[in-house]
Amino acid sequence: MAARNLEKMASIDAQLRLLAPGKVSEDDKLIEYDALLLDRFLDILQDLHGEDVREFVQECYEVAADYDGNRNTEKLEELGNMLTSLDPGDSIVVTKSFSNMLSLANLAEEVQIAYRRRIKKLKKGDFADEASATTESDIEETLKRLLQLNKTPEEVFDALKNQTVDLVLTAHPTQSVRRSLLQKFGRIRDCLTQLYAKDITPDDKQELDEALQREIQAAFRTDEIRRTPPTPQDEMRAGMSYFHETIWKGVPKFLRRVDTALKNIGINERVPYNAPLIQFSSWMGGDRDGNPRVTPEVTRDVCLLARMMAANLYFSQIEDLMFEMSMWRCNEELRVRAERQRCAKRDAKHYIEFWKQIPANEPYRAILGDVRDKLYNTRERARQLLSSGVSDVPEDAVFTSVDQFLEPLELCYRSLCDCGDRPIADGSLLDFLRQVSTFGLALVKLDIRQESERHSDVLDAITTHLGIGSYKEWSEDKRQEWLLSELSGKRPLFGPDLPKTEEVADVLDTFKVISELPSDSFGAYIISMATAPSDVLAVELLQRECGITDPLRVVPLFEKLADLESAPAAVARLFSIEWYRNRINGKQEVMIGYSDSGKDAGRLSAAWQLYKTQEELVKVAKEYGVKLTMFHGRGGTVGRGGGPTHLAILSQPPDTIHGQLRVTVQGEVIEQSFGEEHLCFRTLQRFTAATLEHGMHPPVSPKPEWRVLMDEMAIIATEEYRSVVFKEPRFVEYFRLATPELEYGRMNIGSRPSKRKPSGGIESLRAIPWIFAWTQTRFHLPVWLGFGGAFKRVIQKDSKNLNMLKEMYNQWPFFRVTIDLVEMVFAKGDPGIAALYDRLLVSEELQPFGEQLRVNYQETRRLLLQVAGHKDILEGDPYLRQRLQLRDPYITTLNVCQAYTLKQIRDPSFHVKVRPHLSKDYMESSPAAELVKLNPKSEYAPGLEDTVILTMKGIAAGMQNTG
């Protein structure tokens, strides 16, 4: 029996192998990695749930692969009938299996990419496709490229040490994988990497194989579904875990690589440790826009938590540094200080190392011992404040400023250099100094974000209380006049007797929390929906009134298309106010939002408007002599401004970055950017290299005739997009039927509600669920809608325009990136799948609507390829094509399962014939039956809700971008 079994399994696996795409090149290990993980997974599935379940999963895979090969829609129906015949327990097991197999395919892909990079480093550059625009910027290659463009090494070094990239981590509700699983995936990745190492012994191999099996099984046995929504504190802790695991050690490691790259172009200096190359900020616990769960208490907790973590991370490293610093030779300044501290030392028995008095011939250790005491106290103070709000640790026993913390470390550094021990100084001590300069005492700077309307409410309460009228009814000029007269005066505006609604109290309490915490805990105060100068002045006034001694910089955020268009004028009006110019000291930051502008007008018009707005803003800033920093609020998906980092940076308009870049790293992208050490390194390298290159070798400015054509196309694209999304009276109804948008809220991804207002149409829906829903059905409507109409109309008007579009694609980075990203989305899309959702879920009279959209999809795809000069989608990127082909059968199965399950949830009259349970030994306590019990509170038939949520998570993993 066992032998026959094995034979049968092998033959099915052989069949599966035939369905997999072929290798692309010598360096292509992807098929092997994928096969290994898949085999391990199927063996585990058979052990846990029996042979029939394994066979069923393989049959589903084959039917789906068959559909992906020839797009025969009958196969989708066959697959649908197979999946709906399962009982609730089996349905969850099968869905979970496909979701897991997809995650494993993603891991195989990551290991393959890392492997090819290593090979490329060893072979150095014989990859034709690696040189194309789709690869990232290696710091060393970037420096060499700049020298080829006739920059001197000194100019490059000067630009590099003066630039800043500030990465702002946000807890957008799109990280749909639980942390428990992310950690297991990390270990699977490690096992896989080691298994294919050259010098591996048979014993090692066997142990690694066992570890691999163990981790795959542990991941499969973990409940993928969050049963309760995360709180903002949970999101913050999840975000902070990346500092712990990769970013903390990753920054000094990356800066060493920059030093090496500089050495290779003839610069024998290191990047100064206080050069602010990389900075980190966060929105977790500070972003209250539309999230009532972020209260002033949350903001306070999050700041104290980050300070405690920072002190803890330094503390865990300081003893290692003390071990290294055993030298006796030092300069006079240090010797005097060390002697003074050695004599004043109390015993330190609660430390593990160096607990007795430090001997006189170890002066560095005496200095660092004092630093250790202060770090211990700093951590304790933050911990006590966090748990009870009070602390018995006096303030003079802790570090209160970064300069105070750097001073003894700088003293050690100077002393070593004075005594000829520079190589020692440039070891761990330099790394430590760089960490202190990058992370400070606060670990990350917290941005506060609030809607402009909420500030107006507070001021309205104040003016009404003062009896001078209603602030909200005043004109913009009157508001400005009053705000400026108050800002120039000294009198307090209101006392404790101000009558406050809950909302007003919340805004004022937030300012109060800011005034009570150390100012280095905070970054910017961002005002969403900002339209006028009074929005900014209002925040300046409230900061002063609430006693914030070191006010946060105020950053207006422009999101909707109309706001972007009027942003330059609004900023010019702001700069024309003398009081404000004196306040900002020649520096201003402006944030531009990608998600809402895309939802508002479609991708083409939004991208072009963002481009033009940045150019205009830079002009305005130059006119007033202000240095402008653009803060890019990009999402993870293409519909929300996502896409490969280096390309996005290099396609920004010339002069808009100037060595200062601030950009959000959102939810699901945090894991892709910082989940592993090598990913963290790559992310820091990409941002730094691309920012440097953009500043020193800016992309070309578009020719005047390109601009005219873009303007024309943007108008047509907006018109087409809005005619469907906003003007079509039954569009919202169609959207809610054709996608899982209504079910999205059950995923418990984020702490933020998915709608701004409970009822209402597309306007009130957040940009994230809007895109999430279209990504699920693989129709990606918000990304491509508008492109087709625009291309078609300008080509019909004048056939020469086609050649101009081709010229734009070949010569203008911005246009190329915009088109390439849409092409990538077409590679992941499948109108056949969208048609299946329509057929099952959309009422008959709305069916033609979907058909029309699918015709538009195909037409847009055809025109896009024509403009790009490609015969087929992704013909220039065989690797990406192969990777997408590998994933397709898994995603197709999950899509079919989702569509049919939604049908069962929404249509009580939809009857299915359930087949007997797959595992022979079925009883109430079997593994499959227990899965159904994980969700006892569901309002649907057993198992349906979990099945839908699992398909959502699986498809999100397959698309590699959720919202």
From Swiss-Prot:
InterPro entries: PEP_COase, PEP_COase_bac/pln-type, PEP_COase_Lys_AS, PEPCASE_His_AS, Pyrv/PenolPyrv_kinase-like_dom
Residues recorded as bearing Phosphoserine in the entry: S11, S701
Annotated keywords: Allosteric enzyme, Carbon dioxide fixation, Cytoplasm, Lyase, Magnesium, Phosphoprotein, Photosynthesis
Activity regulation info: By light-reversible phosphorylation.
Recorded catalytic activity of this chain's protein: oxaloacetate + phosphate = phosphoenolpyruvate + hydrogencarbonate
Pfam families in the record: PEPcase
Cofactor(s) demanded: Mg(2+)
GO biological process: carbon fixation; leaf development; photosynthesis; tricarboxylic acid cycle
Claim: Disulfide bond is one of the keywords in the record: no
Gene3D superfamilies assigned to the protein according to its UniProt record, in alphabetical order: Phosphoenolpyruvate/pyruvate domain
Similarity comment: Belongs to the PEPCase type 1 family.
Protein's job: Through the carboxylation of phosphoenolpyruvate (PEP) it forms oxaloacetate, a four-carbon dicarboxylic acid source for the tricarboxylic acid cycle.
Protein name from the UniProt record: Phosphoenolpyruvate carboxylase 2
Natural source organism: Arabidopsis thaliana
Organism ancestry: Eukaryota, Viridiplantae, Streptophyta, Embryophyta, Tracheophyta
Gene from which the chain derives: PPC2
